[in-house]
A protein has these predicted regions:
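Structured, amphipathic secondary-structure segments that form assembly/contact surfaces
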Residues: 4, 9, 23-27, 34-134, ...
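Conserved small/polar residues in nucleotide/adenosyl-binding loops
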Residues: 13-17
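Amphipathic alpha-helical repeat scaffolds
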Residues: 19-26, 144
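Cys/His-rich metal-chelating microdomains
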Residues: 149, 164
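Short cysteine-rich clusters marking metal-coordination/redox-active sites
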Residues: 143-146, 158-161
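Short metal-coordination and nucleic-acid-contact micro-motifs, chiefly zinc-binding Cys/His arrays
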Residues: 136-140, 154
Length: 197
């Protein structure tokens, strides 16, 4: 069994890592296999996406998301409260997005030959004071607590040490994902430090 080497830590976050998480999420959505995204999503968001995906499976549909190109990603908002830090990342993305029947492959919605420009706000959360592990990006599949190969239970725990790694206690986890519509008013405050309770 191969274990990950000790990693250096940082108080910063990598935009490359955050983009990778977004792309892994889209690929898992198309594959209708939510397992790959488990280490990167907070419990509540994971359960919501899992339920949405089960509904696609129940209906016999596949939401195909392909040719994903993150054109722009920047820190839109940083917020901190007494326990957690929150990064809201703005992403401008161009990608194919359509729905097909799983058996006939007939296109039910959208156009497989067209790409759409979409905007998202992704909120990542981690416990205050935690440092980010420097590694090979989102593809690094090691437990942030014990360094064991990443095998996560359905409850979001490391199979080896039992640590719940999807809470933000070890690293940034995706806690919210919103599509930005033309009528969406963006919070332009930048940095928000809530007073300690």
């Amino acid at each position: 069994m191969m274990w990950c080497a000790p990693l250096r830590c940082s108080t910063t976050v990598s935009y490359t890592h955050l983009k990778e998480v977004f792309i892994i999420l889209q690929q898992a959505w198309t594959a209708r296999d939510w397992t790959p995204i488990r280490p990167f999503e907070k419990e509540e968001l994971f359960r919501m996406h899992e339920a949405q995906l089960r509904e696609y499976v129940r209906l016999g549909r596949i939401n195909v998301v392909e040719r994903i190109n993150v054109n722009q990603a920047y820190l839109h908002l940083y917020r901190r409260d007494a326990q957690y830090e929150y990064l809201t990342i703005y992403m401008a993305v161009r990608m194919g997005d359509y729905i097909i029947d799983e058996k006939t492959r007939e296109v039910l919605k959208g156009d497989p030959n067209r790409e759409y420009d979409m905007r998202y706000l992704l909120t990542f959360t981690r416990r205050l004071g935690i440092t980010t592990r420097e590694a090979g990006g989102a593809a690094c599949a090691c437990c942030p607590n014990c360094g064991a190969p990443m095998h996560i239970t359905n409850a979001g725990q490391c199979e080896y040490c039992g640590s719940d790694i999807t809470t933000g206690d070890f690293d940034w986890v995706l806690s919210n994902l919103d599509s930005v519509k033309p009528e969406t008013r963006l919070d332009e405050r930048g940095v928000v430090i809530d007073p300690p309770q």
